[in-house]
From Swiss-Prot:
It comes from the Viruses. Belongs to the asfivirus MGF 110 family. Its main location: virion. This is Protein MGF 110-4L-B. Causes the redistribution of lumenal ER protein to an enlarged ERGIC compartment. InterPro entries: ASFV_fam_110. Residues 1-18 form the signal peptide. A motif (Prevents secretion from ER) lies at residues 121-124. Glycans are attached at N64.
Amino acid sequence: MLVIFLGILGLLANQVLGLPTQAGGHLRSTDNPPQEELGYWCTYMESCKFCWACAHGICKNKVNMSMPLIIENSYLTSCEVSRWYNQCTYSEGNGHYHVMDCSDPVPHNRPHRLLMKIYEKEDL
């Protein structure tokens, strides 16, 4: 009975968070998550390269339009994300992992914001 309840709760959490339920709600490790999930992944780890569109060294956030334009630098991280049941994981590719409960997410942006270089017109 408890297993059925937890399963239903997991499906409801996926619907509330906008995470699709394909393949049992699992997402294999990828550096290119589905477009419809970018809003979720890029909210909690905004320094992932897949969250930004870059051209000529200037980058714009694909999800959060209030983010400033930035200069492409070490702030952007090659991330891989995965989801197994209700555990969401970000891998930064350098042995650092951020693991969180998908239905109770915790942002992991602060350590990376220290490296962000905001684009100024004078930078051209």
